Amino acid sequence: MEKLTITRPDDWHLHLRDGAALKAVLPHTVRQFARAIVMPNLKPPVRSVADAAAYRERILAAIPAGGQFEPLMTLYLTDNTNPEEIIAAKASQFVKAVKYYPAGATTNSDFGVTDIHRCDAVLAAMEQVDLPLLLHGEVTDSNIDIFDREKVFIEKYLIPLREKFPRLRVVLEHITTSDAVQFVLSANNIAATITPQHLLFSRNALFKGGICPHFYCLPILKREEHRLSLLHAATSGNPKFFLGTDSAPHARNSKESLCGCAGCYSALHAMELYAEAFESVNSLDKLEAFASFYGPDFYQLPRNTAQITLMKNPWRIPAELPFPESGLVPLRAGEEITWQMV
């Protein structure tokens, strides 16, 4: 296949940052996607409907001239979130979900939940008004091996959560293991997003020729057997699995440092990366549903009507992109990629 035209996709897990960083990265997403679920982990985080409304206006103001893009907002769940805020979020129409970060799990997660059991009243309100919960599904116990933190989270927290709130719609975000795939398949009212890096790379990519900080993200890349399980899930045609890049921009000097930030930047070339992954298992015919149908169906939103086209036209990913401070290094910077969005 040399050409692929599909319904315009959406990104169901995206970091846009704020200020000058927002203005630097937003054009990449606007070019590829019609909508995106925007993560709330700013400094300070987006904790209220008022915060979300203000952030949404800043995003809309940064859309390039002629661009068509709808930011779908989220609230940052904390120990102090109250049920009244959930009711207001649902009524707002522009807040589409609430994000759970375990405190300290990833970038700007210091305000996260210290004990999910403290959130029972809020989760009950979310179940009642049908507002989805988005989970960064890792435990933060330093005694748990970093490669096992998703599996342990499912066993320790997610299984009891499903039993307590069976009608709550849940997205287990950026899944990385066969354990997560099997859990999502077995549970009702639960879906999962999958990133391009977790479809394309195993943990070997982190250490190819030395430490490779631009492949470091959380949850961390896993064994090859887990990558293959994710690839099978993404290309299976099961509507529980859909696109979420988790594209996370960090300045080069924040990645290439003694204690580098977690996150891969893929918004520039996300659809090309996904196309490469799907083509690797002869499943390009499954890409449209994964990228364009299953996400809006889960969120009970209309599917897009516009289209995009990808062509077999090899090109080289830039070594660096403009970004505040010290530039932004995209995933697989400097390498050739087969597909190109036209």
Swiss-Prot record:
<feature type="binding site">
    <location>
        <position position="174"/>
    </location>
    <ligand>
        <name>Zn(2+) 2</name>
    </ligand>
</feature>
<keyword id="KW-0479">Metal-binding</keyword>
<comment type="pathway">
    <text>Pyrimidine metabolism; UMP biosynthesis via de novo pathway; (S)-dihydroorotate from bicarbonate: step 3/3.</text>
</comment>
<keyword id="KW-0378">Hydrolase</keyword>
<dbReference type="GO" id="GO:0005829">
    <property type="term" value="C:cytosol"/>
</dbReference>
<keyword id="KW-0665">Pyrimidine biosynthesis</keyword>
<feature type="binding site" description="via carbamate group">
    <location>
        <position position="99"/>
    </location>
    <ligand>
        <name>Zn(2+) 2</name>
    </ligand>
</feature>
<dbReference type="InterPro" id="IPR032466">
    <property type="entry name" value="Metal_Hydrolase"/>
</dbReference>
<comment type="similarity">
    <text>Belongs to the metallo-dependent hydrolases superfamily. DHOase family. Class II DHOase subfamily.</text>
</comment>
<dbReference type="InterPro" id="IPR004721">
    <property type="entry name" value="DHOdimr"/>
</dbReference>
<comment type="function">
    <text>Catalyzes the reversible cyclization of carbamoyl aspartate to dihydroorotate.</text>
</comment>
<dbReference type="GO" id="GO:0008270">
    <property type="term" value="F:zinc ion binding"/>
</dbReference>
<dbReference type="GO" id="GO:0006221">
    <property type="term" value="P:pyrimidine nucleotide biosynthetic process"/>
</dbReference>
<feature type="binding site">
    <location>
        <position position="262"/>
    </location>
    <ligand>
        <name>substrate</name>
    </ligand>
</feature>
<dbReference type="GO" id="GO:0004151">
    <property type="term" value="F:dihydroorotase activity"/>
</dbReference>
<dbReference type="GO" id="GO:0006207">
    <property type="term" value="P:'de novo' pyrimidine nucleobase biosynthetic process"/>
</dbReference>
<feature type="active site">
    <location>
        <position position="246"/>
    </location>
</feature>
<feature type="binding site" description="via carbamate group">
    <location>
        <position position="99"/>
    </location>
    <ligand>
        <name>Zn(2+) 1</name>
    </ligand>
</feature>
<comment type="subunit">
    <text>Homodimer.</text>
</comment>
<feature type="binding site">
    <location>
        <position position="136"/>
    </location>
    <ligand>
        <name>substrate</name>
    </ligand>
</feature>
<keyword id="KW-0862">Zinc</keyword>
<dbReference type="Pfam" id="PF01979">
    <property type="entry name" value="Amidohydro_1"/>
</dbReference>
<feature type="modified residue" description="N6-carboxylysine">
    <location>
        <position position="99"/>
    </location>
</feature>
<feature type="binding site">
    <location>
        <position position="41"/>
    </location>
    <ligand>
        <name>substrate</name>
    </ligand>
</feature>
<dbReference type="InterPro" id="IPR006680">
    <property type="entry name" value="Amidohydro-rel"/>
</dbReference>
<dbReference type="GO" id="GO:0044205">
    <property type="term" value="P:'de novo' UMP biosynthetic process"/>
</dbReference>
<feature type="binding site">
    <location>
        <position position="246"/>
    </location>
    <ligand>
        <name>Zn(2+) 1</name>
    </ligand>
</feature>
<feature type="binding site">
    <location>
        <begin position="15"/>
        <end position="17"/>
    </location>
    <ligand>
        <name>substrate</name>
    </ligand>
</feature>
<feature type="binding site">
    <location>
        <position position="218"/>
    </location>
    <ligand>
        <name>substrate</name>
    </ligand>
</feature>
<feature type="binding site">
    <location>
        <position position="136"/>
    </location>
    <ligand>
        <name>Zn(2+) 2</name>
    </ligand>
</feature>
<feature type="binding site">
    <location>
        <position position="13"/>
    </location>
    <ligand>
        <name>Zn(2+) 1</name>
    </ligand>
</feature>
<dbReference type="GO" id="GO:0005737">
    <property type="term" value="C:cytoplasm"/>
</dbReference>
<protein>
    <recommendedName>
        <fullName>Dihydroorotase</fullName>
        <ecNumber>3.5.2.3</ecNumber>
    </recommendedName>
</protein>
<feature type="binding site">
    <location>
        <position position="250"/>
    </location>
    <ligand>
        <name>substrate</name>
    </ligand>
</feature>
<feature type="binding site">
    <location>
        <position position="15"/>
    </location>
    <ligand>
        <name>Zn(2+) 1</name>
    </ligand>
</feature>
<dbReference type="InterPro" id="IPR002195">
    <property type="entry name" value="Dihydroorotase_CS"/>
</dbReference>
